């Protein structure tokens, strides 16, 4: 159904099916070998061998295909303080393992985007806190980014051919979880979840991409009027 939806938009939508040790892509080999850019946006949930699946997809394409992999800022170790692309990672995190697999296969034509928590159309983490009626570790900073800014970042990477890179993609606004989610709950659902204090948390910096690509985040994470239009919270 999703492939058909892409086709209606004038795109070449096709299905990828997978088994434990194999990948099947419903597209002719000669088409795969002539694709210039591959963007991998597959979440790790539901996979016991996520790194192998992602690696197998890459091997279906030619050795010149440029790759953008949407990773996660969740790969960083839990610390109190600022985090950059060079900070310590959780070595057994499935997404970090996938990063390593892709580097083995395509290091010079691969760019990794470590995305912060995504907000956008019908997607906002405040839903979880409203359901639980609790904001844990409320003094930790939020690390979020709007989906539209992620799309803009990908477009800029393709335009400027910024490959063999790793970037954090995260909005520079980092209020505390308490301040942000209390305001979000009131603005979007008239909720009032309880705040639970904790040990603090990491503040992920995205300045490397801003500096190297000349990128500016256009979509604020606290535009409640816009978020109210595109989300249902009750």
Which ranges hold each PLM region?
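Conserved Rossmann-fold cofactor-binding substructure of NAD(P)-dependent oxidoreductases
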Residues: 7-35
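NAD(P)-cofactor binding segment of oxidoreductase domains
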Residues: 25-69, 97-101
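Conserved Rossmann-fold NAD(P)-dependent oxidoreductase catalytic core, especially the SDR/UDP-sugar
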Residues: 55-90
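Short-chain dehydrogenase/reductase
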Residues: 83-102, 140-145, 174
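Conserved beta-loop-beta element that borders a ligand/cofactor-binding pocket
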Residues: 100-121
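Substrate-positioning beta->alpha
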Residues: 112-118, 125-127, 134-158
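Mid/C-terminal beta-alpha module of Rossmann-like enzyme folds, strongest
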Residues: 151-206, 234
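Amphipathic terminal alpha-helices
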Residues: 221-234
């Amino acid at each position: 159904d999703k492939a058909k939806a892409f086709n209606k938009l004038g795109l070449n939508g096709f299905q990828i099916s997978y088994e434990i040790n194999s990948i099947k892509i419903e597209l002719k080999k000669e088409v795969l070998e002539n694709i210039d850019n591959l963007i991998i946006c597959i979440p790790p949930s539901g996979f016991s061998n996520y790194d192998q699946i992602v690696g197998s997809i890459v091997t279906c394409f030619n050795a010149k295909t440029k790759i953008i992999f949407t990773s996660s800022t969740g790969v960083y170790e839990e610390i109190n303080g600022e985090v950059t692309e060079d900070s310590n990672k959780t070595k057994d995190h499935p997404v970090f393992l996938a990063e390593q697999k892709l580097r083995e296969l395509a290091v010079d034509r691969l760019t990794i985007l470590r995305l912060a928590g995504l907000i956008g159309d019908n997607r906002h983490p405040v839903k979880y806190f409203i359901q639980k009626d609790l904001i844990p570790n409320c003094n930790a900073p939020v690390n979020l980014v709007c989906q539209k800014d992620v799309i803009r970042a990908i477009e800029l990477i393709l335009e400027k051919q910024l490959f063999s890179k790793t970037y954090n993609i995260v909005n520079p606004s980092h209020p505390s979880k308490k301040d942000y989610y209390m305001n979000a709950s009131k603005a979007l659902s008239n909720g009032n979840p309880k705040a639970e204090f904790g040990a603090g948390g990491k503040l992920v910096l995205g300045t490397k991409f801003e500096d190297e690509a000349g990128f500016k985040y256009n979509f604020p994470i606290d535009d409640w009027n816009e978020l109210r239009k595109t989300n249902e919270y009750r």
